[in-house]
From Swiss-Prot:
This is Probable chemoreceptor glutamine deamidase CheD. One of its GO terms (biological process) is chemotaxis. Its EC number is 3.5.1.44. The lineage of its organism: Bacteria, Bacillati, Bacillota, Clostridia, Eubacteriales. Keywords: Chemotaxis, Hydrolase. CDD domains: CheD. Belongs to the CheD family. The keyword Signal does not apply.
């Protein structure tokens, strides 16, 4: 079987079964969320931009927000036969890509995104197995659904598995 590499854009999500890969690039302050069911060999990847949808009205793309994307991704995985209790998460991104003289939480969107993703995963009872968060460099996330492995390519730092 040919292994497909399925792209996940910014404010996007997708699902795949073994042996395919889900890939998202451009994780700066954004956070990539890989959810995997080892029993079924099925996973999903979301690329969120913002932590919280409650400050917005007329939301056209719910996947942009951590609080909406995670439940939607879980729902899509359940439609494929995944048992939510089997899901495990690996997350990456949440960098501070810009230096501001005001270091307030309002400006630190990367940190806020990371915290929001952790909060919604906990609320959904999905444990986080590993993470690669923070710093000040962009990342690419490569999620291999054959084993649930996630490789992170960080600008200027090479590739590591989380």
């Amino acid at each position: 079987m040919e292994i497909k590499e399925i792209k996940v854009g910014i404010a996007d999500m997708n699902t795949a079964g073994s042996p395919h890969r889900l890939i998202t690039i451009g994780l700066g302050s954004c956070v990539g969320i890989a959810l995997y069911d080892k029993v079924k060999g099925i996973g999903g990847l979301a690329h969120i931009m913002l932590p919280d949808s409650t400050q917005f009205s007329n939301i056209k793309n719910p996947v942009k927000f951590a609080d909406l994307a995670v439940p939607l991704l879980i729902k899509d995985l359940e439609k494929l036969g995944v048992n939510k209790r089997n899901l495990k998460a690996k997350i990456a991104g949440g960098a501070s890509m810009f230096n501001f003289s005001d270091k307030s939480m309002i400006m630190d969107i990367g940190n806020r995104n990371s915290a929001a993703v952790k909060k919604i995963l906990e609320k959904c009872s999905v444990p986080i197995l590993s993470e690669d968060l923070g710093g000040n460099k962009g990342r690419t996330m490569i999620f291999d659904t054959s084993q649930g492995g996630v490789k992170i390519r960080t600008v200027g730092m090479g590739i590591k598995e989380i």
